[in-house]
Amino acid sequence: MKIPFKPFILFHLTLFIRFILTPQIQYYIKSGGNHLSFLSRLFGPKPIIAKSRFITIEDTKTAPFTKKTVGSGYSMRPDVYYIVASVELGNTTTKCILTATNLNTSRTYLLDKTVKMTRDIRPPREREEVFGKTVWGVELTKEAVSELVRDTILESLRRAKVDIERDLDFVVRSTGVTAGFGSPEEVGKLIIALADGCLAAGIPPRKMAPALSKENIPERLREFCYLDRVIFDGAVASVIPPTGREVVANEMEGELVTAGIKVGSKWTNVDYRNPCVSLDFGTTLAGRIVNADEPYARTVGNFCGLAGAIPDAIIRGTEMVDCRGGAALDLYKKSILKGANWKKARRHAERIHDEIIDIRKVPANRKRFGTVPVDTEAAYSAGTTLIGCDAGKNGDKLPELTEIGHSIYQEDGIHTLFATLDHVSALIAKRLIDEAFEEGVIEEGSVLGVTGRAGITGTKPSLILEYVKDRFRDCIFVSDALAMGAAVMARCMNSMGTPHKPLGGRQNGPCILGMRRKLQSRKEDKWIE
């Protein structure tokens, strides 16, 4: 039966108004008028979010072939997975995340994600040396860190049913705990404590160091190993660090998240290769600005300072979380933003930024910015721009944020308070990017990648996208980028690549394996000047 055209159109228009447009208008009015209009919410650009995908260890062993991406049938090349453990000690959380990378497709999956709160680390015992503390003042000793790391690794391996000898290929250690250290070099003590924890969990040393030759690689992985053609020379996903000296104490975090966002983008249509910008909104801020040089891009900018510590300080004003180590994630749930007054939240966030949050190029005379040790001399002599975020000076206004959080909670409730946190984080991202463009360090055609709990939860992706959409070719939000970056680093250290699905090089460009071979074949003492 032929349906009359006009009634058909009217019927669907009525459905659109009744079930889509009307609820959006009602939400807009009820919320006090979010700066994102309901038309923007409906028809504006949507954030591209690459969420972690889980598989089991059995899946890595029983799925022998990869489905073709185009057309029907199967590729006759068997699937091979590279299993890596990322061990992370952060200011707020300590994690062991097990990843499995399909070396045919270059896609990385999660096997397990075990998370513990760093504040729950046991206190120092008699005769134990306190070598540092978290941004919240939680004291750390070598023995306590090792025990926490050991227990976290063993729990993760047990949950994922991963055997250390048979299944696990590599372990990468990293830390974002930098506030309690006097210099970037002192972070090395914490890395050693992490290594001791790995050894205590039964991880053999050979699984924490790169292979010296292809013969040291397990036989099932040798087909994907290029150690006989190129060696690891410090570049991770075709990006080299700023200088021979660390310019910020959490430099490794910036390196890993940049690589992790690259591998996370493989789940999307975004080509997140060079030039690119990364922002990691953990408790402390990390990230890089990368140019488009080949074969190795250079880090021309670093982000440092405070990030998630700012909303954490605000949320403590509710007195619903621990006054010392409490975090916004303790209270966060998907329904927390329902009923929020977004108009008020925006005003609260702007007040916080006007009165407390300091975002700028790090002055040359500073040894710390946002509690994070920095080496401005090394950075600026190498042509690397440091851009920092602080609350007052080295976090001395964090208590004021707690007072403001208490006031907002008392007057407007928990929902508007969390909406305020979203606006605060979005404005931090906006100001960081604005500062970088003013300094002229972001190349045209760059892609922005954002990760970290204070950058990808709630409505933060939509708010950030609204601010930066006209400045970048694309913008992508990736969960667990640090862990996926650890998987990339493990592959780079062992020269295990996927030339047909490259992570390195320029956007829309080919694999850089040939250029690397040509560069390394030169009889020079130094490949990277």
UniProtKB/Swiss-Prot annotation:
It holds the Pfam family DUF2114. To M.jannaschii MJ1451. This is Uncharacterized protein MTH_1153. It comes from Methanothermobacter thermautotrophicus (strain ATCC 29096 / DSM 1053 / JCM 10044 / NBRC 100330 / Delta H) (Methanobacterium thermoautotrophicum). The lineage of its organism: Archaea, Methanobacteriati, Methanobacteriota, Methanomada group, Methanobacteria.
